[in-house]
């Protein structure tokens, strides 16, 4: 960011909220290319080549404004060449460059806030790491939960409209509209409901920025409603009703105002606190109150999506479940409420009596069927969970093959360290271990039994090394003291970067 700010010091247009001239600066695309190379492995790198040229990008932008958008040819959509150039390459270049440009106001605002003397505190917004203590401490006190899938907008134009509150440069927004419109014309044979899905895969950085802006506005409105409800709830109910009774007598001195009517008319102000948790496109609403209260918030969300974001959502698809009877999927875990019943005998003087004590505890399980489906998609096993050889890795060295399998296995154990039961993970380890052996046997053109007899089982000894054993070898004193003082599950702070099941599809 410091290097990028050095370029911006030479270009004064951004200080006047003019981002449009930056689209014609070559360092923007160089910076976007460097970001693509240094990006996390969760996103694929953009395939720039040596033939890319800023001059062609300028010509392509000029042609966007000149061509007739009312004439669309279905035959032209199948052509890989646009004006004699590779349309996929330069559409990705413009997308990556524009994503960098629209992020400038947010980045500079963040840098300026960090340099200031007073840092604005957002008490309602938390890091993703706060989800784990929430599951451990507060979730067991709740009764009802509703897992909500945040709907995608029907058209990307809705995402562009959200940027109007953040980006004040109208020329940049017009260019973004032209680009999205042209991208749709280049792919006119795409089914409309799959358009956003394809755009998100080919232009991940720009789509993530647009979608995050959309979710940010949605959550700001939702948190405003939630805060208003909580502030009204915190008002003293006795004094609140007394003031209403007093003002009622002043306004209608002849008529009698019944205090019993006030709680009925203002019942909706006494709602208990609503908990909201989100990761990517999936969120959870949880409360200790009745299902009627949850239904009210469900229709709040539906009306918010339909009236403000013009997104159709069916209320019937948002299910409200009781935690003690249903489980829900979130962050790659299958979570449910486990109730442990115990009987306590109490004696006072000569009288003794029995008390039933119910202890609630959150139970986080490994979704074995989803994990097997993920391994089947990556060709480590079949649909039934039977291990198969990874044919695409057979050309690698033995060390690389074993290292890849061991890395996947340890990452899964690392991710599901917060699971209540590890039995399903040992099945996943068995699948990966046998798939590794079959891959090595295929490379050496041998059978599994012959290969193991020749090299021995010590070759795959790393598969049997638990992560807890690795930690005990690295930090022997600290880890032994930790295990003596704490017997519960362990949540690692980097787990959301590992498991592909967490990424909401």
From Swiss-Prot:
This is Maturase K. It comes from the Eukaryota. GO terms for molecular function: RNA binding. The lineage of its organism: Eukaryota, Viridiplantae, Streptophyta, Embryophyta, Tracheophyta. The gene is matK. It is found in: Plastid, Chloroplast. One of its GO terms (biological process) is tRNA processing. Belongs to the intron maturase 2 family. MatK subfamily. GO terms for cellular component: chloroplast. Usually encoded in the trnK tRNA gene intron. Probably assists in splicing its own and other chloroplast group II introns. Keywords: Chloroplast, mRNA processing, Plastid, RNA-binding, tRNA processing. The keyword tRNA processing applies. Its main location: plastid. Pfam families: Intron_maturas2 (PF01348), MatK_N (PF01824).
